[in-house]
Amino acid sequence: MSKFNRIHLVVLDSVGIGAAPDANNFVNAGVPDGASDTLGHISKTVGLNVPNMAKIGLGNIPRETPLKTVAAESNPTGYATKLEEVSLGKDTMTGHWEIMGLNITEPFDTFWNGFPEEILTKIEEFSGRKVIREANKPYSGTAVIDDFGPRQMETGELIIYTSADPVLQIAAHEDIIPLDELYRICEYARSITLERPALLGRIIARPYVGEPGNFTRTANRRDLAVSPFAPTVLDKLNEAGIDTYAVGKINDIFNGAGINHDMGHNKSNSHGIDTLLKTMGLAEFEKGFSFTNLVDFDALYGHRRNAHGYRDCLHEFDERLPEIIAAMRENDLLLITADHGNDPTYAGTDHTREYIPLLAYSPAFKGNGVIPVGHFADISATVADNFGVETAMIGESFLDKLV
């Protein structure tokens, strides 16, 4: 019999809690990640007021230097620790796949200086359309169409851009490049990015409509992902007939593998929390696992190195945390974590190699405290242990520590 009937895992995308032991093997604009500390530097430079996460034990997580404005609780309501990454990457897919039990020894490729000419030329030859070279770099999806949409409307050229993650995105005005054509080009791009030196996690079709100065991305987005290279705990749950619910970009990250209820993309963190609350309230969701990603911390503030915005985003989540707790049933378990760091005070604009926090709360808890420092995959091992299924490749359960 399961200790918890339902487990809700919420990933605060990029909310790291200090440089990992191997952080100096990873760099940002030539600067090793060894001094990165997303939560620590936000707390130190702009202040951080997150009383609801603090109540569970955020300030109790072991650190060389305590969080400046998040005090340790003498009697927290839950359990806390930090987790180290094993895999050789610091991107979203690597982090999430490891959380679900995989060890990624061959990381995906990211293109901070844009895609190589060879790829762009192949896409041009296949599509019969030129590619706008100036857009070929990490770009905000809304900014790139504002900047190059008018030109695309005049010339029919393709807008191809990337991000901090291993993705190739193609933006196309629906009146200029029909959806069928856009999808066909994306399928070709997928076929040429399945191995090094351009092993990409996703190809994303990004259609939009409107006039210059008033462009809007449509719901006709299409993701062409790769499935995890081995079964994750999501697959193990699915095979055992245990419901899995995905909120936000989780379904895309796993290419649907092991997920039988996709609750859709988030328009914002707030919308994602609304969707999570709706999911938790489903009468038919009596037993199972929900997996939510809230990406605004990373996409809107981490990469843009906006510490004030990042702090405010954390405040907004913390203010809504009581709603999530109120929606829990007696035998529910809530796990709050991250997938990598993205220190908004650091060099460059890339993710940072960090520990991730882990907060655990349940109305059924009788105890509290600090769990020994572990690894990302311990989360999925704990989920597997709870529901009586096998773990994936790696991970040690901490279920017996939650009392």
From Swiss-Prot:
Keywords: Cytoplasm, Isomerase, Manganese, Metal-binding. The keyword Cytoplasm applies. It is an enzyme of class 5 (isomerase). Pathway: Carbohydrate degradation; 2-deoxy-D-ribose 1-phosphate degradation; D-glyceraldehyde 3-phosphate and acetaldehyde from 2-deoxy-alpha-D-ribose 1-phosphate: step 1/2. GO terms for molecular function: magnesium ion binding; manganese ion binding; phosphopentomutase activity. GO terms for cellular component: cytosol. Mn(2+) 2 binds at residues 298, 303, 351. This is Phosphopentomutase. It comes from Streptococcus pneumoniae (strain Hungary19A-6).
